[in-house]
Amino acid sequence: MKFRGLIHFHSCYSYDSVLSIKKIINFALNNNLNFLCLTDHETIEGAQELKKYVEKYNLPIKIIIGAEYKTSLGDVIALNIKSNIKSMEFDEFVKEVKGQGGILLFPHPYKGHKEIEKIAQHVDRIEIFNSRVDKKNNKKAFKLAKKYNKNTYCASDAHTFLSLKNCILEFESEKTSFIKALSNAHITCLNCKNSFYFEIIYSQLIKSIKYRSFLLFFSQVKQFIKLCLTFRLFRRIS
């Protein structure tokens, strides 16, 4: 069977997004997606609500429960977990995820991480393309995956509806379970495109409002003005 869907994106259950569960479902149906791995920051609540919605309306979409957690070494994604991970100390985090039968993904390796090599050795897949990351660091992620002979994946890391289409993935699962295929199968990216600069500003402004951070808000306004003056606001990250 061929699976087509998204890995690593965010909804209104994240602190930097207002993307609704209903809009995610509509996107999936309109683009013939049959699996979704929603990975909100620090919580599986969004993924659980997504699954409830799919089950309520009996939709042909497989939902994998997961989240993106800020561990002691940086962001790591846990998929196929049953409850929120409690320990953020990296070694304990890994044990807890594996204890739940989960899968570990390494998102945007060269953005906000420490001990990158250590993380790479413990995860199941490494993200070699992130639409919110520049070309140079995506290339470094590809080399990292190759060095440790790790399976790979690509992600939109979408925080807005517009970004959802940046990275649709496809893989096949015939003689094994979906979860085993998600961990081991070769995943193809059908349309990897970078996000626009204004989308990053938008998500950070949402974060500043949800956290009531005036410092972050004004820093993003400043960045907005800078991008306008340099005519980059509506350009894709390069």
Question: Where do the PLM segments sit?
Answer:
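Charged catalytic cores and adjacent phosphate/nucleic-acid-binding surfaces used
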Residues: 1-11, 21-27, 45-51, 72-84, ...
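Mobile, glycine- and charge-enriched loop segments
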Residues: 1-15, 62, 95-101
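Surface-exposed amphipathic alpha-helices with a cationic face
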Residues: 4, 51-55, 89-105, 142-148
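Divalent metal-dependent hydrolysis catalytic cores, especially in the metallo-beta-lactamase
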Residues: 24-43, 103-105
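Catalytic cores of extracellular degradative/oxidative enzymes
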Residues: 38, 66, 76-89
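Short acidic, glycine/proline-enriched helix-loop-strand junctions
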Residues: 44-64
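A short, structured active-site edge motif that brings together acidic residues
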Residues: 64-71
